[in-house]
Amino acid sequence: MDSNGRFHSDWCSMIYSRLMVARTLLTEDGAIFISIDDREVENLIKIGNEVFGESCFVGNISWQKTYSPRNDSKGIPAEKESIIVYGKNLEWMPKKLPRTAEMDAKYKNPDNDKMAWTSDNPCAPGARTHQGMVYAIQHPFTGEMLYPATSSCWRYDQSTMFDYMSGWCEYELKDIGDNVERAKICGIDASEVRKDVKAIVLKKSLEESKKNAEYVLKRGQWPRFYFTKNGKGGIRRKTYLENVDGRMVTNLWPFAEVGHTDEAKKELKALFNGEIPFDTPKPVRLMQRIVQIASEKDELVLDFFSGAATTAHAVMLQNTIDNGNRHFIMVQIPEKLDGKYANLCEVGKERIRRAGKKIKEESPLT
């Protein structure tokens, strides 16, 4: 039946009407996440583009829903499911995720600085449009003139860079007649390059400058821009852990981070004393991530296809984690079930009661 034209037409009409209502209910800074399999994902995006506007399309997330593909599957076994995301307005962006211990472990403190840091690129793109940030910096250990990479400029304006470099030894600004070199970096003719940009050069002799720089190197707490290979290498920039935000949300969500279908069934089984009253639940971690990146602590979360109320479970759990006060509305057709519960709505209501009780008992906030 799923493959006939009438079913497909009815599905499209149902989704279209639901999305129209959803768009009306969304706040201006809201977003919608729609889970769909491969068969209808293309049609869903077409409908979503019509309802929300193509410019409000945020992404197509691939959720790795299984850790063990079925051997008896016909064709290519499906390991992932799509989650289509639209914002109410084109400026909507997901919140960043908390950093992991593995990410933070990359930050070290070899020079006994005020905080841990990692080595980063001293340059930024945009040489042609930022010609005032393309100039030479003289190496305090070797005397070599250092320039940004091709098509790049230094990360900060010259005044800021001058202050950072002065942490190694005394510097001064000087015209060294390097317009040709600077023009090459900018990708323009020498006649077009900005002419009033001076180099940051050593104020004293290389011998004196090197002596001072070696003292700073041994002392520790190096300036923000430092030199690799014990002073003999190139220039790099410190990025401090304290100044780094969370990690960006990507369109690949592996089961190791957000759970899989077997995990979802085990969660239901644990709540319902060994029973699994619904065959296709979503894992709590999956819905919790959506709540985490798409809502503020005091917002309302609506699920149009709530199923076994995993979203409600996730909202309650996230509230305990970040001390939030989110509320939820679960919408579900009372689909009849075989077994203890008459319909799917009863399963959802019972899950909310049981999950809420469990979370309250285990929460450090209560």
Which positions does each model-derived feature cover?
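Conserved S-adenosyl-L-methionine
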Residues: 4, 8-12, 39-43, 280-360
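Class I S-adenosyl-L-methionine
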Residues: 1-300, 322
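Short, intrinsically disordered, charge-balanced linker/junction segments flanking boundaries
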Residues: 360-366
